[in-house]
Structures are given as C-alpha cells and as structure tokens.
Curated annotation (Swiss-Prot):
One Pfam family recorded for the sequence: PsbN
Gene name for this UniProt entry: psbN
Family the entry assigns: Belongs to the PsbN family.
Subcellular location: Plastid, Chloroplast thylakoid membrane
Alphabetical keyword list: Chloroplast, Membrane, Plastid, Thylakoid, Transmembrane, Transmembrane helix
Name of this chain's protein: Protein PsbN
Principal location class: plastid
GO terms of biological process kind: photosynthesis
Gene Ontology, cellular component aspect: chloroplast thylakoid membrane
Organism of this sequence: Angiopteris evecta (Mule's foot fern)
Function: May play a role in photosystem I and II biogenesis.
Length: 43
C-alpha cells in the first residue's frame, strides 16, 4: 500500500477511537463521576 493510504487509515482510526472514548466518558460508567456546575449553583 502507499504511504498516503496508510496515513489516512491511521488518522481515521485515531479519530474514530477518540470519538468512541469521548462518548464513553460522556455517557458510560465514568459519567457518574462528572459534576454538573449548573446544579451546584442554586439561585
């Protein structure tokens, strides 16, 4: 395979894995540990 193809595949895989990790952090098990600043400030 050509170098440009390998680089494009690598960057695509990196982007997909980063997006998957971000979604897991936002909506998966670690999301229970996130704090909500809007709930902390009661007016």
């Amino acid at each position: 395979m050509e170098t440009a193809t390998l680089v494009a595949i690598f960057i695509s895989c990196l982007l997909v894995s980063f997006t998957g990790y971000a979604l897991y952090t936002a909506f998966g098990q670690p999301s229970k540990e996130l704090r909500d600043p809007f709930e902390e400030h009661e007016d």
